[in-house]
Design a protein with these regions (language model features):
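Bacterial N-terminal signal peptides that target proteins for export
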Residues: 2-14
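Beta-barrel outer-membrane channel/assembly domains of diderm bacteria
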Residues: 28-129, 156-160, 206, 234, ...
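Acidic, His- and aromatic-enriched active-site or binding-groove loops in soluble protein domains
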Residues: 148-156, 192-197
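Extracellular/periplasmic loop regions
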Residues: 258, 266-357, 421-423
């Protein structure tokens, strides 16, 4: 286990090392560039205005008695971004407001991004502040941009990018406030973790369309239960992502394994795997197919101190995989019944997702997508069939100009008795979701000097 003092010492050493390593090379780079071009500075102001209306029938109820659930609402998200760039330095700030039309109060306003990055001629860089993380297919670390609040992290990132190689190391430490009287316990904060360290390596062959990534994550979480105050439990994730993308077809796959201990000091041993292939017979058509499997538990998990679960079986090992901080809406069906929302009473039976899709692009500005998902739990249970349901998805995207995107979609799921039992959805098994999304990305100003 990595202690609190070791975390602070390691972080201080890294900051000092980067500070000594970067300045001489970046200053020399800036001086050489200045002699050739006087306009070294670029300042940009842009925005993103997103409005999305949704209609749900048979969604996620608040209680067992509210099975037949309907909802319709309009969401809005507004971002204003300031960007500064010079030869060796970049800085970016994004303010974000999100709300439901008619919502009492002022909605949610936060500083979504606020970071500065120094880069050297040799490919070394350091980036510190609140920033968006997006790696590989975003299955484990992503922006989660479909959610109105999206996801960003306050951390230090250092790395190297050159030739066919990229290496990124990330270090995060979270606290509730700056008060020394509050101790070092971190609960109910902006992020679920107190400590996080990630190491990512990517290799892209310069002449062959093959890429490979390795990812390691170490996450320290403190429990909300009083029995576990002042204890930080660490869980790890390690895995790989591979892709091969020649001209008209592609194949990609990933495997991740989780281990360590969760916030209730329970052992973790979980895994997930995915494969995906696509083929484009013409420029207008693309066929897509794939399979995801995420390990699960055959029974409800109960922590040593109790407090959650049905109490049916006491687990010593958690086998239900958690996709941690990925962009979950991209996977496992567009209706977001899995991993963006939990199973009933915290059950984690895992998931299998078989899918097929067709994409049609009649013109450059217009695209239609159709997909089918067969969804099932991954474990054998004594009282439930594996099948969760069948989901059909239809969507269209129209981009009349680069600043404007119009999107709409409709999804239908026929859920099984297992779906009804685990997700408490509509008893007739038929679930509907329709949405319309409008995104405008204007650029107000860009100046160079």
């Amino acid at each position: 286990m990595i202690t609190y003092n070791k975390h602070i010492k390691l972080l201080a050493w890294l900051v000092a090392s980067v500070a000594m390593l970067l300045p001489s090379s970046v200053l020399a780079q800036d001086e050489n560039t200045q002699s050739q071009d006087e306009k070294l500075n670029t300042f940009t102001i842009d925005a993103e205005l997103m409005t999305r209306g949704e209609l749900r029938y048979g969604g996620l109820p608040d209680s067992e008695d509210d099975i037949n659930n309907k909802a319709s609402f309009i969401l809005e998200r507004t971002r204003l971004g300031l960007d500064y760039e010079r030869t060796f330095i970049k800085a970016h700030i994004t303010g974000q407001h999100s709300a439901v039309w008619g919502q009492a109060g002022k909605g949610s306003f936060n500083l979504y991004e606020a970071w500065v990055q120094l880069t050297s001629r040799q490919g070394l860089f350091a980036k510190i502040g609140r920033q968006v993380l997006s790696y590989d297919d975003e299955r484990s670390i992503g922006s989660n941009d479909w959610a109105m609040a999206a996801t960003s992290h306050g951390l230090l990132k250092i790395g190297y990018e050159g030739g066919a190689h990229k290496v990124h190391a990330m270090f995060a430490y979270n606290q509730n406030s700056e008060s020394v009287n509050g101790g070092t316990v971190y609960r109910n904060g902006d992020k679920p973790y107190k400590f996080m360290q990630n190491l990512w390596y990517h290799y892209q062959h310069p002449r062959v369309p093959f890429g490979a990534s390795l990812l390691f994550m170490n996450i320290g979480i403190q429990s909300e239960l009083d029995n576990y105050v002042n204890k930080t439990h660490y869980q790890q994730l390690v895995g790989t992502y591979l892709s091969y993308k020649p001209s008209n077809w592609s194949a990609e796959g990933s495997f991740y394994y989780q281990f360590g201990r969760n916030e209730y000091d329970m052992e973790i041993s979980a895994w997930m795997a995915s494969v995906k292939a696509s083929y484009s017979p013409t420029r207008q058509w693309q066929l897509v197919g794939g399979y995801d499997i995420l390990s699960g538990d055959p029974f409800f998990a109960v922590p040593p101190g109790g407090g959650i679960g049905l109490g049916l079986v006491h687990h010593k090992t958690i086998k239900g995989f958690s996709p941690v901080y990925g962009s979950h809406h991209k996977f496992y069906g567009a209706m977001d019944f899995f991993y963006l929302s939990t199973y009933y009473n915290g059950f984690t039976p895992g998931l299998q997702n078989y899918y097929l899709g067709v994409n049609f692009k009649p013109i450059n500005k217009l695209r239609f997508d159709v997909a089918y998902h067969y969804l099932a739990i991954a474990t054998n249970t004594k009282y439930l069939d594996k099948t969760l349901g069948h989901e059909l998805e239809f969507s269209a995207v129209y981009t009349p100009i680069k600043e404007i995107s119009l999107m709409l979609g409709y999804s239908f799921m026929h859920g099984s008795k297992t779906m009804e039992e685990l997700k408490r959805v509509d008893t007739n098994g038929n679930l509907h979701w329709a949405w319309l999304n409008v995104i405008v990305r204007p650029r107000f100003l860009q100046v160079k000097w």
